Amino acid sequence: MKVAVLGAAGGIGQALALLLKTQLPSGSELSLYDIAPVTPGVAVDLSHIPTAVKIKGFSGEDATPALEGADVVLISAGVARKPGMDRSDLFNVNAGIVKNLVQQVAKTCPKACIGIITNPVNTTVAIAAEVLKKAGVYDKNKLFGVTTLDIIRSNTFVAELKGKQPGEVEVPVIGGHSGVTILPLLSQVPGVSFTEQEVADLTKRIQNAGTEVVEAKAGGGSATLSMGQAAARFGLSLVRALQGEQGVVECAYVEGDGQYARFFSQPLLLGKNGVEERKSIGTLSAFEQSALEGMLDTLKKDIALGEEFVNK
């Protein structure tokens, strides 16, 4: 199983590469690519960690050597948020980066599963889909927007509030991956109940958690380490499913049946072909139903922005 990380010299990319080097199954290959000249050195640094994962680093304009034979491609390349910016401010720079890298994936490893981490995910996934479609290689079961950070944050905040072990809480999060489009389904967490105020406060905290980190880092970056952990969790789940493990479920932002929007984050059963089944979002509380209806315009606009970027 070969995993490629594009944007591997960045804050998320390095954290992700470290976690994959230590946690990928024995015999896996890990390929690191970034435009930054330091990237082969990051691979040498990680190669000294004693795990049976082969690692190589590539830099420069051409990602092809890193992508050859990849089964999973995780894309974290792009600029990070600074205080006062929201994820959509990143669009102008990151849209072009994602378009370019996905064009290279389409040429070199068109059958790979692709996880998009680069923000704004609501839009960059639509860009990736349109690029793959133009190249004639789009498979909607193999393109994912990685929203796992919203899930791990939800798990952490709920566990803190309710005095639970973080490992025993799993909150499904649906919708998109920014602001009001992030909708944690707190009504579906087994064995935990919340007051209306707690639901409102937690939902808001989960939606704004990225900004909390950006502000706390005071201009020094955005959420890189927790995002690295979230991306590793998703990537490792995908690898296990591709290798035939049954019953692997993760939430991610994918093209579905269009019931809510063309792309929508929901629980997915993963398997040898990527998405095996898009699971139902289940029964929502009145609060969740209203939040879902209220976000769809924003989500659809985000998606249209990405489609237009490729097709203009």
UniProtKB/Swiss-Prot annotation:
Q: Which GO terms describe its molecular function?
A: L-malate dehydrogenase (NAD+) activity
The record's InterPro entries line, in alphabetical order, gives: L-lactate/malate_DH, Lactate/malate_DH_C, Lactate/malate_DH_N, Lactate_DH/Glyco_Ohase_4_C, Malate_DH_AS, Malate_DH_type1, Malate_DH_type1_bac, NAD(P)-bd_dom_sf
Matches recorded under SUPFAM superfamilies: LDH C-terminal domain-like (SSF56327), NAD(P)-binding Rossmann-fold domains (SSF51735)
Q: Which reaction does it catalyse?
A: (S)-malate + NAD(+) = oxaloacetate + NADH + H(+)
Q: Name one Pfam family in it.
A: Ldh_1_N
Q: Which residues form the active site?
A: 177 (proton acceptor)
Superkingdom to which the source organism belongs: Bacteria
One cellular-component annotation, GO: cytoplasm
Keywords on this record?
NAD, Oxidoreductase, Tricarboxylic acid cycle
Give the matching PROSITE patterns.
MDH
Q: What is its EC number?
A: 1.1.1.37
* GO BP term, pick one: tricarboxylic acid cycle
Name the residues that bind NAD(+).
Answer: 7-13, 34, 94, 117-119, 227
- Going by the record, the broad EC class of this enzyme is oxidoreductase
How is the quaternary structure described?
Homodimer.
Query: Which family, according to UniProt?
Result: Belongs to the LDH/MDH superfamily. MDH type 1 family.
As for what it does, the entry says: Catalyzes the reversible oxidation of malate to oxaloacetate.
Name it: Malate dehydrogenase
Annotated source species: Escherichia coli (strain 55989 / EAEC)
Designated gene of the protein? mdh
